[in-house]
Amino acid sequence: MIRNLVLCAAVVSAWFSPASARPSNDELKVMSFNIRIDTKADGPNQWSNRRDFAANMIRFYDIDIFGAQEVFANQMTDLQERLPEYGSIGIGLEDGKSKGQHDPIFWKKERFELLDHGFFWFAEDINAIGQRAWDAASPRMGSWAILKDKISKRKLFFMNVHIDHIGQVARRESAKLILDRLGALAGDLPV
């Protein structure tokens, strides 16, 4: 429930002004996309058979900004190669570089300028790279970006998270961390 609320807040909050006052070019399309890890155990649904579909879906829906989950380094590369019109940030949650899952953020480069970004781990120490905390099944992290819309000149805050699917305590504590990070990082920017 809290996870859904946070995700909704991250992608649906008011975009600076009432919808009726917005020109059509001020529309913002955002998406959260769990692409699923790359594993041969998925048989015909493995990543090598899904990667083109994933990129084509992003283009079909003309997404401005999206957060993806369960993205390994090779999948990150595949998305970057297939979506060269998008800028991206993302690091591996196990080493802060490329090892393990990434929770990247992608944005249309022609529309947005990246002003700032960062990462935090769902742990007692948010800077503890790769730490599994509380009763989580695996380490988890969040990514955030401050983007400036080149059309409207307005800034926004976007956060992408992937909360643990097993640990009840981990989910509750992660939700608290998300709210804390939103308050500390977003300031008065729309989320």
Give the positions of each predicted feature.
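Bacterial N-terminal signal peptides
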Residues: 6-14
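His/acidic metal-ligating clusters that form di-metal
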Residues: 23, 139-161, 168-191
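Surface-exposed cleft-lining segments at the edges of enzyme active sites
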Residues: 39-42, 126-134, 161-171
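Active-site/binding-pocket entry motifs
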Residues: 36-38, 112-113, 123, 164
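N-terminal, active-site-proximal structural segment of metallo-dependent hydrolase catalytic domains
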Residues: 4, 16-82, 94-101, 119, ...
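Structured beta-strand-rich core segments of catalytic domains in phosphoester-bond hydrolases
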Residues: 65-159
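Preference for well-ordered, secondary-structure-rich cores of eukaryotic proteins
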Residues: 48, 82, 107-108, 113, ...
